[in-house]
Amino acid sequence: MKRFLFATLVALVFCAATGWAQSSTVINADGTVTFRYTNPQARDVQVDVQFAGRNPMKRGADGVWTATLGPAAPDMYPYCFVVDGVSVMDPLCPQYFPNEGFKNSLLEIPAREGSLAHDIKDVPHGKVEYIHYYSQSLQGTNNAIVYLPPSYYHEGNQQRYPVFYLISGTTDTEEVYYKVGRMNYILDNLVAQGQAREMIVVLPYGNPTKLLPTSPQGMGFGMDVFGNDLVGDLMPYVESHYRTINDADHRAIGGFSRGGNQGLSCGLTHLDKFSYLCSYSSFTSTTLPNVYDNADDTNSKIHLFWLGVGTDDFLYGTARDYMEFLDTKGIRSVKEYTHDKFGHTWMNAKYFLTKTFPLLFNPEASEQAMRNSQPALVATGNEQAFTPGVMARLFPRPIISPEFSASGVTFRMKAPEAREVQLQTELHARPLAMQKDDEGVWSITLTDHLTDVFKYCFLVDGTQVADPSNMYLSPDKGFKHSICNSPTNPYSLATMGNIPHGKVCYDLNAGTAQYLPPTGNPTVLIRLVAGPDDTPESWFKVGGADAIADKLLAEGKARPCILTTDAQAKATPGIKMKVRTLKASSYPSWPARRKALEKMLLKN
């Protein structure tokens, strides 16, 4: 009882600390945006937003910092607050940018007239499923997201569909084309308008070795690592679990930034598997074997070779050079340029999707686009180019946090101007002091709770900050904590091995998520009720409910079950199922909630 009361007190302190900072954004009638951020103890606050850059905010007597910027064109823009030199997300913005590194919130400015391509409209919507699959080439488990068209699950439907493998950029997770690129809504809208064909879209993770405890021996990251996983592991998984058409005429591959490079490299070296190639703000190698020196053969295998880039993109010079290279080799390609979307941005990525979705798996439209293609724009000598210096500026030497070892887990935060940095977790009664080194990096090593999964953040001079080096964010309603998920956790995907995995189906508009087992007929329905600060994703992103069920089922310790965050869910009529309910609010921390779920699964 004492331990429970202690844990409850910690949870109350932890949650209370997340609620003090308040902010909101207001879209004004003239198209300007007013940003607000409450932090009475901050010395300096700036707002950094894609359409206006970094700008100072003014502090009011009530401790609310404000700035009005713009006007800005209707679209979605990443932004953050810079508090005393440290970037923080807007604690009251529900939308965020899922990224390995930087932490940004998302500002959505609606159209004043008409609508935007990515708007959520009253049209039939496809399904979004999160999957895990064991990759023999990586020797570990990888992630992907699968979009299924609106008709896929219609009763009696046995139709097979073409597949588009769509890859996000450097430091992006597999979620970015879903949560930032809004590819599902763009495609839903185009299909409803009769402007695109129904298709399956697979969103791979472009940096798969990051998911593993250590990179397999002899494996450095490169196109071959990603391509081997996609062609040798992900594609076979998709084609054995979904109704796909498995030939080159019905496969497409493409992506944004690094994903465009990976997509072109993989596609051009596997023209027996892909005939639609799309590059958004990118380019690829000009030395790929057996591709460029036999134009007639290469052209005969490609329905669509589509290249898009902004003239204000830092990759424009290199991308333009690649377009010109293709022209000189006689390789046909469609070229698209933008001039008003702030360069290397997801505004461009969304726009390029609206241009290419109507052409995919439509040979007539693709051929017309290829025939109407124009030569690359003539070089002016003033183009931005992707140089080692640009690379170093955009991707500085990373801070590793959290870093796991046999003796503990080390957390690090670079904040050279901070006076005090502390580690705050849901498992400790008080924040823990961190020590600063000569380079301004603060650190602390924990030797307890090494196998737990828990939420944490840093307190930088009293301001809550998510770990900028940790890609795993808790999808909380307010401030979004980081997640510490050690490979020694018994349900860690990184060390789970080759077992069957179920899938998690999200409907974020309806506010539900559902896990379906990989095999067997479910005999148990467990309703996972979210806590007051949780979202429909929390039981799976932090609670690891799907991973727990997968492993116990693979070990024969649990029966096939359905896990749902719909608190009103009922068993399917005519099917005998036990119905159980697990409330997050009944437990003081995520380790306790995970243990309760494990116990419930073992009992049933």
What spans do the regions from the language model cover?
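Non-catalytic cap/lid and distal C-terminal segments of serine-dependent acyl enzymes
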Residues: 27-54, 59-382, 386, 393, ...
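Positively charged n-region of N-terminal signal peptides that target proteins for export
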Residues: 1-4
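Bacterial N-terminal signal peptides
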Residues: 7-17
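A short hydrophobic/aromatic micro-motif that marks alpha-helical segments and, especially, helix-coil
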Residues: 17-18, 274
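Boundary at the C-terminal end of the N-terminal hydrophobic targeting segment
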Residues: 19-23
